[in-house]
C-alpha cells in the first residue's frame, strides 16, 4: 500500500561485495527480540518522510556465529516500533549518520544508517541471513535491469525528438538544411538504441511472466521450469540491460551534441542516473 516502506541494510564501510567481513552485531533479549548494533552505508531510502514507517532488513552477526558469510543472520528493525494493537509507538534506536551526495538519482535518499542498540526480530533461521535476503534478489535484479532500460528509453525519446527538429547540414538529393535525422550516422545511432530498447523490453516482459508462473501456476512442473528460467535470466538482465542501457543513454546524449551536455534537455541527468544501475 505504500503506507510503510522498506530498506535493505547490507553494506558496511569495510564490507562491500565481501559481506563476510561485516561487523554489525545482534544479541538476544529476554522477550525473544534482539538488540542490533552497527553502522551501514549506501542504504537506499534508509530514511525519509514519505511514509510513516521504514522497515529495515539488517544483516548482522549473533554471538558465537561462524566466520564469514555462514555466520550472518537477518533482522527486521522498524524505524518506529509497533504497539500490540498495530499502532505506531516509540521511535526505535535507528538514526541517519549522513546523507550521501551522489552523482545521480538525487530524488532517492541514500543514507549512512546507525543502529544504536535498536530492537529487531530475526527473520528466518540463525546464520541463514543471506539465504533469506536472497529470496528477494531475483525481483531486485529484474528491477535494476528495468532501471537501465527505462533511462535508456527516456534518453532515446529525447534524442529522437531533437533529431527531428534540429536543422544542420545537407544531404545528397535534398536542397537546403535538413533535420539531423536525415544523416545516416544519426539514424544508425537512433536505430541501434531502439533495437536495444525493444529487445530489452521483450526480455523483461518474458522474465516477469516466468516469475508469475513460478509463483502462481497450478502445475508444479511448470513452476519448477519457470523458476529455473528465472534463475538463469535475472542475472543476465541485471548485467546486460544496465551495461547496454548506459551505453544507449550516452548515445542519446551524443545525438544532441553540445546540447546533450547541458541541463536544458535533460540528457546529462539521464546519463548520471543510468550510471548507478
What is the predicted function of each stretch?
Residues 259-277:
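Glycine-rich phosphate/cofactor-binding loops in nucleotide/flavin-utilizing enzymes
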Residues 5-9, 37-43, 53, 93-98, ...:
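Glycine- and acidic
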Residues 42, 81-97, 102, 109-140, ...:
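A glycine-rich, basic-preceded beta-loop-alpha segment at the flavin cofactor/substrate interface
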Residues 141-218:
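Extended amphipathic alpha-helical segments enriched in small hydrophobics
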Residues 33, 37-91:
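A short core secondary-structure module
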Residues 1-24, 28-29, 208-223, 227, ...:
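Internal maturation/activation junctions in enzymes
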Residues 198-240, 253:
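C-terminal helix-coil-helix/basic helical segment that borders enzyme active sites and/or dimer interfaces
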Amino acid at each position: 500500500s505504500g503506507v510503510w516502506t522498506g530498506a535493505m541494510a547490507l553494506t558496511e564501510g569495510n564490507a562491500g561485495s565481501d559481506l563476510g567481513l561485516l561487523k554489525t552485531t545482534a544479541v538476544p533479549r529476554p522477550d525473544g527480540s534482539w538488540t542490533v548494533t552497527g553502522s551501514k552505508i549506501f542504504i537506499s531510502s534508509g530514511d525519509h518522510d514519505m511514509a510513516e514507517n521504514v522497515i529495515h532488513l539488517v544483516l548482522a552477526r549473533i554471538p558465537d556465529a561462524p566466520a564469514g558469510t555462514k555466520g550472518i543472520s537477518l533482522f527486521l528493525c522498524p524505524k518506529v516500533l509497533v504497539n500490540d494493537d498495530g499502532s505506531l509507538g516509540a521511535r526505535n534506536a535507528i538514526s541517519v549518520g549522513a546523507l550521501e551526495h551522489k552523482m545521480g538519482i538525487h530524488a532517492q535518499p541514500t543514507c549512512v544508517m546507525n543502529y544504536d542498540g535498536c530492537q529487531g526480530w530475526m527473520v528466518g533461521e540463525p546464520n541463514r541471513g543471506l539465504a533469506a535476503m536472497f529470496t528477494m534478489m531475483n525481483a531486485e535484479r529484474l528491477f535494476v535491469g528495468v532501471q537501465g532500460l527505462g533511462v535508456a528509453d527516456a534518453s532515446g525519446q529525447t534524442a529522437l525528438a531533437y533529431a527531428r527538429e534540429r536543422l544542420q547540414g545537407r544531404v545528397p538529393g535534398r536542397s537546403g538544411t535538413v533535420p539531423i535525422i536525415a544523416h545516416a550516422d544519426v539514424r544508425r545511432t537512433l536505430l541501434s538504441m531502439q533495437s536495444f530498447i525493444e529487445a530489452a523490453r521483450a526480455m523483461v516482459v518474458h522474465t516477469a511472466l516466468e516469475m508469475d508462473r513460478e509463483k502462481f501456476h497450478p502445475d508444479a512442473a511448470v513452476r519448477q521450469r519457470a523458476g529455473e528460467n528465472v534463475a538463469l535470466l535475472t542475472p543476465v538482465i541485471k548485467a546486460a540491460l544496465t551495461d547496454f542501457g548506459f551505453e544507449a543513454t550516452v548515445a542519446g546524449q551524443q545525438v544532441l551534441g553540445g546540447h546533450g551536455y547541458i541541463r536544458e534537455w535533460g540528457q546529462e541527468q539521464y546519463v548520471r542516473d543510468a550510471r548507478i544501475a
